[in-house]
Amino acid sequence: MIDLHTHSVLSDGELLPAELARRAYVAGYKALAITDHVDSGNLALVLAQLIKVSKDLNKYMKIKILPGVEITHVPPQQIPELAGLARKLGAKIIVVHGESPVEPVISGTNSAGLESDIDILAHPGLITEKEIKLAKKRGIYLELSARRGHSLTNGYVAKLARKFG
């Protein structure tokens, strides 16, 4: 089992990265990406901390830790720049916080994310058929979330993903 979208105390999570990794390992996970929320103000700082702790934990633990980011609530036009910077700085997993139906995410975020160098579009809400096809073409994964609210469109996203991909 793996989880490629988790948060630590570096954003809105409750655990230090080491405790998050330990708990995941005990629960049977083989790999864990820590993808804390970032924007232009904290991307470099958060990612540097996650890269350091991931390197340290990978020396001593039997679970693979991947440093990453979740680009969150930024203007869609800024997503390509931030994704490129995150990749350049060493992010192994780049997530974009999609247009969830329960948060005021800016319209156009899904499309901008799918046009950028990202790995996962998280909780994409009422994603369009065109966007689903673009995700398939670019090899970008779409997240189905267990989180309350974000999960409201899981059935819709899964149905379209099956239809087109």
Each model region followed by its residue ranges:
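Short, well-structured secondary-structure segments
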Residues: 31-34, 66
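Non-catalytic positions within long, well-ordered alpha-helices that form the structural scaffold/packing
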Residues: 25-28, 87, 114, 162
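Glycine-rich, proline-tolerant flexible connector loops at the mouths of alpha/beta enzymes
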Residues: 33-46
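Histidine-centered catalytic micro-motifs
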Residues: 1-11, 34-37, 124
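Short acidic/histidine-rich active-site segments
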Residues: 37, 164-165
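Short, conserved loop/helix-junction motifs that constitute active-site signature segments
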Residues: 135-136, 161-164
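Conserved N-terminal beta1-alpha1 strand-loop-helix module at the mouth
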Residues: 12-28
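Extended substrate/RNA-proximal surfaces in nucleic-acid metabolism proteins
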Residues: 43-149, 155
